Amino acid sequence: EFDIANRRIETHVCKRLPVNWNAAEEAFMEAYHVKETNAGGRDFSEPVTTYDVYPKNVNRFIHTVGSVNPRMPSAPSEQELMRALWGRRGPAEGDCPTVPEGATARDVYAEVIKKSLGEQYDMDFSQYSTAQTLDSIEYFVFPNFFIFPGLSLPMVYRFRPDPKDPDYSYFDLYFLRPSEPGSSQPPPEPMRLDVKDSYTLSEGLGFLGAVYDQDTDNMAAQTRGFKTCAKGGQTLGNYQE
């Protein structure tokens, strides 16, 4: 359905993280952190997410992009949602499209993405649904493998322990982009980043480079918390955990 067989590694970043590999990967197993960690409390940033658990070792979340924040006192218009989505693309992309009467911002933005990526890769993506195009769809396969098979968020994660220090780990981040059936392109050499290096050094990550900085900047503090906390275990929330 996602045609994973016809993907190629376009970007590969390997970063050393100042936290145990298991704790590092748990940071990417839920979407509840998005509102504060990634969005600074901005409107429309509440993650509308469903979680599924499959036996024996697979789970999935689907975070719908461009959905209404259920905690907002009043629902935004589709045009307001469209402006929020368009803001991701930057000023160089031109004026924000108008959402026609009866249409949704999600559907309009998905068509923009399919057209843009179709021109970039010289391929037809019209068969992709709005959800397949826009949404953050993550499958986790125990113990350390994640894949996002969507069109605009095409990531693969792998987390590995540091063999010399259990308080550090390695995070391999890949972007899998579409390729024509039968084509063969060698994968790029990984860009290796140390703990204090920014993901924005990788041009291939685009605007997501800054997002990954936000996702991992608090991990050293997490390790310190593990070492100093008097509790014997974790405290889990009753929502999205």
What are these regions (language model features)?
Residues 1-241:
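C-terminal catalytic domain of Rieske-type non-heme iron oxygenases
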